[in-house]
Amino acid sequence: MSAYDIMDSMVESYSKNANHNMRRPVVKEEIVDFMRTRQAQNTGFLKELEEFAHQENIPVIPHETVAYFRLLMQTLQPKRILEVGTAIGFSALLMADNSPHSKITTIDRNEEMIGFAKENFAKYDYRQQIELLEGEAMDILPTLPDNTYDFIFMDSAKSKYIVFLPEVLKKVKVGGLIILDDIFQGGDVAKDIKDIRRGQRTIYKGLQRLFDATLDNPDVTASLVSMSDGLLMLRKNIENVDLKHIEI
């Protein structure tokens, strides 16, 4: 039985726990619609996967981020890419398709999504370019080589970004780029903690620690990008980045 044969039960389970703040864009709705409809659309298997994800309520990067990543990959042509958070493999396949000479390592712990990703990598014949590592990111990251990756994309548990960051910074090359997705949390990050729902405060606190560690840190060049639910972009400027003694 293929992964798609058991799709309904898998998707229902995943969707209950997925982060849906990407549906609360911080940019004006009409501008979001403009970016999603006027920029070049996906074709072929990427269009198929994007439509499947939308139909089944599986979070993948929205189309304005797709267009941005398409530009980044074609311009930077990174040789080694690391992704934390595979889901169904859409973003890994997008990066692979637009940087054909890259080698991509992607990490995920969710067995349901791993099943989809494996099938998609095989179905679209990207198994030689994309390596999927199964397990907890904090267990896997220390086993990967340091100063190796040109580009790292983090799209996993937002409260854990600050926990993963010290290891991730070891893995990226000096001059390399790290992008962290969904960091505005629908605008919550700009609020006082007393205005945040209790169930969201762990994420809020984790993101505030992330901002404290990076936004004014000379060891990295940081930029917040108001695209979808926000991107944090980091360029590693020196080999040993000091995260300002932030308690991890």
Describe each region flagged by the PLM:
Residues 1-151, 158-179, 183-248:
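A short alpha-helical cap/connector motif
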